A protein has these predicted regions:
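Conserved catalytic cores of phosphodiester-cleaving nucleases, focusing on short active-site segments
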Residues: 76, 137-155
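Metal-dependent nuclease catalytic cores that hydrolyze phosphodiester bonds in DNA/RNA
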Residues: 1-136
Length: 155
């Protein structure tokens, strides 16, 4: 049986983005500038990645990183399309995903273990911000996960 996800209409403000000194900031409706969560996390020590890059060399590191990023993007699109009911509403388009073997297998694991716990999708690919923490970012999905309204990020 194919899943059919319910989408709950909500209105969230669009957040503009600006880049200052190679750092992304989101502009709230109140004109506050908050750094993206990615910008905040990029400040953290990347010692492990740096050591790996030194060990394998730039060419290998760039190749592996590029392949992993492309695979992650494909899995992300599969999750998004699945939650948008593409499997049942546009089966021919959905079949295209099956041609990407490894991403399809990874998606299958997410589908069976994670995506089935999602219901009542409120938003996808939207900007969120916190006045309390003074940070912002884009979220993959806001929905109920096991009955609890949650922010969901596909990684």
């Amino acid at each position: 049986m194919m899943a059919k996800f319910n989408h709950v209409p909500v209105e969230l403000p669009e957040l503009k983005t600006v880049t200052v000194e190679r750092k992304r900031f989101y502009v709230t409706p109140e004109e506050k500038y908050y750094p993206s969560i990615t910008t905040v996390l990029s400040i953290r020590n990347k010692e492990g990645l740096t050591e790996w890059r030194k060990r394998v060399g730039n060419d290998v590191a760039n190749y592996v990183s590029g392949k992993a990023a492309a695979r992650g993007t494909k899995v992300h699109h599969m999750c998004e399309d699945y939650l948008n009911n593409m499997e049942s509403e546009w089966p021919d388009k959905w079949k295209e995903h099956e041609k990407n073997f490894l991403p399809w297998c990874l998606f299958g694991q997410l589908k069976s273990k994670v995506l089935g716990n999602i219901s009542d999708i409120h938003a996808q690919e939207c900007g969120l911000y916190s006045d309390k923490y003074k940070v912002a970012g884009r979220v993959d999905c806001i929905a109920k996960y096991n009955g609890v309204l949650s922010i969901i990020d596909f990684k």
